[in-house]
Amino acid sequence: MKRTYQPHNTPRKRTHGFRVRMATKNGRRVINARRAKGRKRLAV
């Protein structure tokens, strides 16, 4: 049986990347929440 997670950087960036997050209001909310929490990595 094939495992569910087959990592690839392109789709990863396209769905969870910084620019994608900044594109929507809710995405910006995610980034700000992670900033407030003090995350080292804000997006992928």
Swiss-Prot record:
Molecular functions (GO terms): structural constituent of ribosome
GO biological process, one term: translation
Coiled coil residues, start to end: none
InterPro entries listed in its UniProt record: Ribosomal_bL34, Ribosomal_bL34_CS
Domain of life: Bacteria
UniProt key word S-adenosyl-L-methionine: no
Keywords on record: Ribonucleoprotein, Ribosomal protein
One CC-aspect GO term: ribosome
Pfam families found in the cross-reference section: Ribosomal_L34 (PF00468)
PANTHER family: LARGE RIBOSOMAL SUBUNIT PROTEIN BL34M, MITOCHONDRIAL RIBOSOMAL PROTEIN 34 FAMILY MEMBER
Family of the protein in this entry: Belongs to the bacterial ribosomal protein bL34 family.
Protein name per Swiss-Prot or TrEMBL: Large ribosomal subunit protein bL34
Species: Aliarcobacter butzleri (strain RM4018)
